[in-house]
Amino acid sequence: MDSSFSQKIVVLGTGGTIAGVTTGAPELGRYRAGEVGIEEILRNSRLVGVKPHFELMVEQVCQIDSKDLTVEHWQVLLSRVKAALLNPEVKGLMITHGTDTLEETAFLLSWLNLTSKPVVLTGAMRAFDAHDSDGAQNLRDAMQVLQALIEHRMGGVRVVFAGSVYPGHWVQKTNAQSLNAFQSGPNDDRAELIEWGANWRPRDFEPPADVWPFVRPNLNTILERGTWPRVDVVMSHAGLVGGSVLQALVEQKRALQNPQPSAKLGVDLEGLEGLEGLVVAGTGSGTWSESMREPLLELMSMGVTVVLTSRVPWGHEELRGHPLLISQESEDNFLEDLAKTPLNSQTQALFSRLQPLKARIALALHLMG
């Protein structure tokens, strides 16, 4: 394209089903993700409607099945996003992504609150060469939404999928097969249907209030660090005996802090990073099995930061009685105290609403701050 164009849109490809190719009988729905490059995907999608004053700058960041997404992939993606956002000629970004972890990347970009420029993510539920592939239409919709956001000077992170626009902070994959695979609330009340027409403009989603009680790390800090702190997720569930997973984490943490006896415990420490944070996906409105009490206390005594949230996707927006962040300085009777503690800060309510995997990202970023 003509390099004299002053307005650019960056398109970053990362693989996923939208880049997948079918294997075997089409009716079985089997495919390999991340096989097709972003240039070919864009050519196939016939991106009609790209306005003449926009130039597309296309880059292949990675070609993976998004279930295999790593921190290293995120680091590369963040570096490319940073480069694009620092370029005054770039007006917006589109990222193609596998749906399995799309919500995590969307949350990461939204939580970092990088820029006033719009970022749109999209993907597909059917492979690139499937007869019923939805990727091309999702791409066309995403490009139209991105251009509308640019023209209305609206920033933020959004996911465009199956004719709807979702705020990056709240979006969640809720269906493993349907083309309409995402939601952003119990009644999808945070989603916006795309209504094409001369006067249509995207809704200006209100971003989450910036009440996270700790400083979010600067993007440069994240990129310079390279590695992220290890943060795991454990779930409270029926039949939990002795907090078995937690107990294993305790034994591992002990061995890392005192490696000499580790051989006796049968703990292999090679290549293992010490646990720094733990997200507990509690039941209901953020409750937990009593059997988790002692191992949680021991992990906290060894310096692990513990965050409580709920495994239930919706309905705990107004959690009562559960401060979210628990530091190792908390008293031993913290679990009993939690039940007596009224919700007295906006901070607790906001972080309570985070689903476990998003809470994990927020906690990891906090530990880097």
Language-model-detected regions and their locations in the chain:
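ATP/NTP phosphate-donor binding region
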Residues: M1-A84, W314, N333-T341
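Short, well-structured alpha-helical segments in soluble
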Residues: Q75-P88, L249-Q252, V267-L269
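A short helix->loop->beta-strand "cap" motif at the edges of active sites that frequently abuts
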Residues: V90, T115-P118, S301-V306
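Short Gly/Thr/Asp-enriched flexible loops that form oxyanion-binding sites at enzyme active sites
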Residues: I95-K117, W288-L297
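Internal gly/pro-rich beta-alpha loop/helix module
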Residues: L121-W200
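C-terminal non-catalytic interaction/assembly regions of soluble proteins
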Residues: L265-D268, G282-G369
